[in-house]
Amino acid sequence: DELVEYACYCGNYYGTPRKYVEDQMERGRDVILEIEIQGALKIKAKYPDALLLFVMPPDGETLKKRLSGRNTETPEVIEARLKRASAEADGIESYDYILVNDDLEKCVDELHSLIACQHWQVKRNLDFISRVRGQIKEF
């Protein structure tokens, strides 16, 4: 129960410490996790207001070139990662939004915009709405 989520990705186990996530949330901070679909769905089940963003390349060939261009993985590992990416892509509909990582700066800006929009959802601002509504009624 020390991990809020964990999953096996290409033969390695990864997890997110619960204490870190909860500490950040208590401080009112946004928590950004770079996790695969198993973990993302676990997060959404535990935190229904979580925003799930699927970051994807502009096309399959770009993904393959990026993985190969790193020169850090064996051909077998690259093949395993491409197969995993295919399986993950089958679950995109479980996410709230996609971000196309074609231009890094643009992708980061879009990420920030989506997060900012979440802060202004009506359901997240009921106290503010109630306060202003009450003030207006005093006129």
Give names to the regions the model predicted.
Residues 1-4, 66-73, 114-117:
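Conserved AAA+ ATPase "sensor/coupling" helix adjacent to the nucleotide-binding pocket
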Residues 31-36, 45-69, 100-101:
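Conserved phosphate-donor/acceptor-positioning beta-strand/loop module used by diverse small-molecule
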